[in-house]
Amino acid sequence: MEYDIKTLDNGSAGSVALPEEIFAVTPRSDIMARVVHWQLAKRRAGTHRTKGMGEISGTTKKPYRQKGTGSARQGSLRAPQFRTGGVVHGPVVRDHGYDLPKKVRRLGLICALSQKAAEGKLIVLDAANGVTKTREAAAKIKALGWTSALIVDGAVDEQFARAIANLPKIDVLPTIGANVYDILNHDVLVITRAGLEGLKERLA
């Protein structure tokens, strides 16, 4: 697959051959869904927690006698049927993450890359650097027509990352951080030359 290389100034910088085993695979939505669910599960903080019947503050005294009142028998005001009672089988602090085979994760990333290429939403960029001001970055990105873009670079240039930090829906990640969720969550996928080499090594 031959792809034209663009520059940040919307110019041309030659072409590059993209490996078909990474960018021309038939996308599988089931695999990508599994990887996205796995990613989102690992991102969850898991700090949710409720108090059970034994943890609620308050008296443990029986509210009234067992018989003769005409009301249903009650043994504690901490019981879950009361407004101030404990919660039955409530959430506890836990890790929501689970294991996903490395082969599935690798295939999911390849499918996401191939889907962007098939949709014509993959752009190869010469380099993502040389921009230090947000105004300058915004002008260049507007000229390129990107409204939602993920830029994957070999090693993220700090000045460039700061310049685009306040631009909505424009993000940059190093090759090692490229993932299915962020790729699918952006309209355009932009890969630099260095990022392309890094992806080849990572997915070899």
UniProtKB/Swiss-Prot annotation:
The superkingdom of the source organism is: Bacteria
Residue ranges of the region described as Disordered: 44-76
Key word Hydrolase present in the record?
Answer: no
Q: Which Pfam families does the record match to this protein?
A: Ribosomal_L4
Give GO BP annotations, semicolon-separated. translation
**GO molecular-function annotation terms?**
rRNA binding; structural constituent of ribosome
Going by the UniProt record, its keywords in alphabetical order are: Ribonucleoprotein, Ribosomal protein, RNA-binding, rRNA-binding
Q: Which GO terms describe its cellular component?
A: ribonucleoprotein complex; ribosome
Output the Gene3D superfamilies linked to this UniProt entry: 3.40.1370.10
Q: How does it assemble?
A: Part of the 50S ribosomal subunit.
Q: What HAMAP family has UniProt attached to this entry?
A: Ribosomal_uL4_B (MF_01328_B)
Question: What is the role of the protein in this entry?
Answer: One of the primary rRNA binding proteins, this protein initially binds near the 5'-end of the 23S rRNA. It is important during the early stages of 50S assembly. It makes multiple contacts with different domains of the 23S rRNA in the assembled 50S subunit and ribosome. Forms part of the polypeptide exit tunnel.
Q: Which PANTHER family match?
A: 50S RIBOSOMAL PROTEIN L4, LARGE RIBOSOMAL SUBUNIT PROTEIN UL4M
What family does the entry list? Belongs to the universal ribosomal protein uL4 family.
Its name, as the record gives it, is Large ribosomal subunit protein uL4
Q: Which organism is it from?
A: Gluconobacter oxydans (strain 621H)
Name of the gene:
rplD
